[in-house]
Design a protein with these regions (language model features):
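A short, N-terminal "cap"/entry segment at the start of jelly-roll beta-barrel domains
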Residues: 1-42, 91
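Double-stranded beta-helix
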Residues: 4, 8, 107-135
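Conserved short histidine dyad/triad with adjacent acidic residue
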Residues: 23, 41-63
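Conserved hydrophobic/aromatic beta-strand scaffold that supports enzyme active sites
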Residues: 41-43, 68, 90, 98-100, ...
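Glycine- and acidic-residue-biased ligand/ion/polar-headgroup-sensing regions
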Residues: 45-46, 64-81
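Short beta-strand His + acidic residue motifs that chelate non-heme Fe in jelly-roll/DSBH
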Residues: 52, 78-80, 100-101, 106-112, ...
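Short acidic-glycine-tyrosine-enriched beta hairpin
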Residues: 82-103
């Protein structure tokens, strides 16, 4: 796992990249508990089951949209930005890799025809005018 911290405010986690070939444990929580967008990687064997459950409704306050891309097919070049809007890192994601942006900006260049990604972000989505600002 690659964690990208701010050069402007060291100690602030901006972005994270996890590669498919790094999965080794049965369960790994790969995001710090204080982030709004949470992710665990589960490596499971045939026959594994879970107890049926549902999640508790509770009010939570979020102050930023955090986003993740999972590459399903193809490849993507990620440009990650620091909190001062300067590029801090460039990373290429291949099939089954993922990126997470907690703070700072990002941009993506699609490298292969018919690339497919899943995009996850914290909600609720209130429209583009309340979600992002261009760098």
């Amino acid at each position: 796992m690659k964690q990208i911290f701010s050069k402007i405010e060291p100690g602030i986690l901006l972005h994270q990249v996890f590669r498919y070939n790094q999965i080794s444990k049965e369960r790994e929580d790969i995001v710090p508990e204080n982030e709004f967008l949470q992710l665990a990687i589960l490596k499971m064997q045939k026959g594994k089951t879970f107890k049926a459950h549902k999640h508790i409704i509770k009010e939570k306050i979020t102050n930023i949209a955090q986003e993740s891309w999972v590459v399903i097919k193809g490849s993507v070049k990620c440009f990650f930005y620091d909190i001062d809007d300067t590029i801090i890192e460039e990373v290429i994601l291949e099939q089954s890799d993922l990126s997470m942006t907690f703070r700072g900006g990002h941009n993506y260049e699609i490298l292969e025809k018919d690339t497919i990604v899943y995009e996850f972000k914290t909600g609720p989505y209130l429209g583009i005018d309340f979600d992002k600002t261009l760098i």
